[in-house]
Structures are given as structure tokens and as C-alpha cells.
Amino acid sequence: MCIRDRDADLLGAEAAYCALEDELQRYLDTYTRTHDYDEYHFDLDTIEHDPYVLLSIVCALHEGEWTLDEVRGTLQMLFDRQYILTEDVVVEVRYRTVTRTDSEGNDYDVEVPYNYYICYVTLENFNLSHVPVYMMSEEQLSMYALYMSTLGNRPDLFPSSGYIGKYITNRPPEHEVPESYLDDETFAAILKEAEKYLGFPYVWGGSSPSTSFDCSGFVSYVYNQCGWSFGRLGAQGLYNICSRTSSPRPGDLVFFVGTYDTAGISHVGIYVGDGWMLHCGDPISYANLNSSYWQSHLYAYGRLP
């Protein structure tokens, strides 16, 4: 993390955030025992975060140097942004049959109204890595990207983090584009620009080298540096301006669906030929499109106008 900070503060901040999550989990686990409704419906995201994302955000917001006591308010603020809990109660008027006895000793049934309470509990995990773009200045977002790209020079601190595999122990595959493909001057310029950012971390909403990129921000930036001028588009927006092609060539775009929970196009990369793409995964890297993962999400190839 921030290498100038003490381990006790880094570990303490992570522990404090985990304590907030544990409290929320206990609240949900005991919900039916601590509330008195007739019926419950739960739609709950998993409660989880990555410690490097958390501490990179904290370091960027506090300019690198902080103590645990100084960031407790920040931790609570981030927690409140990440987890959105809603509890809605619907009251239905229902009827039950009650047997009564009249003055002559005869039994008879009547329908008696009563309130029936149905509770709907929803927990949305907004994903902590999506929070920075909504609350940081460009300078802060740049610092966040820097901390994430190096894991704060402390990959030893949280060895179970998924980012250890992504950035340290299981780095993305290398790929060399055949020289003959670079005879196309336009593609050569695209590839030269795109390869400048190999290894940059994925930053949700990022769209420049200073902040790093997300998938569509990366593609938009590269092509706008190479003669296009369509501005910053999302993955769906890029798809919308492309012409679909069943015979992709280097420099075309490749689109995917279902890589995360969103409607329409969810991911985009730059096709470089021979079944490979260069894209802003995490980090920016080459990827083999023939892998089972990418094949299962592949939607279309597109050519920019």
C-alpha cells in the first residue's frame, strides 16, 4: 500500500472495514429473528471487497500519509457508498375465517380482515472498485491508479488478494503481432499507441493515461489519438457506431456480452489478428480470443467508420 505508512495502520484500516462488513452480515443473518414480519424476501449481493482497492482509495484521498484514526470517517463513507441496503414493507389486507356462536348457540363463520406484513430486503454491493470515478478528482484518480498498478509496493501485505495473481504471480500472456500486419499504417499507429499502456490497471470510468482506463475508455482514447474524433464512448456506444463484420482484420473492434451484470455490450477490445485482442482487462494486456471464457462471451466484430 502506501509504503510510507505503518503496517499497523494499513492492516488496521482493512480490519476496521471488515468489521463494518461483519456487522452488516450479522444484521442480515439474524434478520428474521430480530424482526416481526409475516413473510420475508431477500435479494442480497455478496459482502466482499479487495483490500488493495480499499487502501488504494484511502491513500489517494489522503495523499499517501494517514493514520487509522484519521481515516475512520473515510472508511465509513466508502462503506456507505459500496453497500446499499433497502428494506421495504408491504402491508396486505387479508382475511381469515373465524367461527363464532350466535345467541341461540349456533356456530357460524365470518371473514375477519387482518394486516399481513411482507418485508423485502435488498442489498446491493456497488463494487468498491467502481466508487473512485464518482468521488475523486482527476489527480486523485491518477494516484489511485498508481497505487493499484504497484499494489502500493506491498504485494506481501494481502497475499490472498485476487490482484496478486493478476499483477504478480500469474501475469497475462505476452503476444507479438506479426511484422507484416504493420504494413497497414493505420493499424501500426493504433498498435503503437495501445501498447504504450500495457500493464496499466483497470480503473472503472478511467479514460486517459493519467487516470488509467476502463475497457471502453481505453479503446476510445487510443482511436481518438489515431485519427478518429468520436470522443469518449462506452462499449455499447462504440458498437453502435461500428459496422459489423464477419471477417475481422487487425484494427477492428471485438465486442462481448455478459462479462458482468449489465444490459447490452459489456466489454470491448482491439482485434490484432490471429485470434488475439489487446484490451483493458485488469491490467491492460493481450488476450487469446480462443479461450473458453472469451468464446462464451463473444458477441461480434465491428469496424469503425
Where are these regions (language model features)?
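Catalytic cysteine-centered active-site loop
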Residues: 197-250
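Short, small-residue-biased leader/transition segments that mark boundaries at the very start
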Residues: 1-2
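Second-shell loop/turn segments in exported
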Residues: 176-181, 202-209, 258
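Non-catalytic propeptide/linker segments at domain boundaries
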Residues: 58, 77-181
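Stable alpha-helical elements in mature extracytoplasmic
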Residues: 20, 186-190, 194, 214-215, ...
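Extracytoplasmic/periplasmic/luminal assembly and interaction segments
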Residues: 18-74
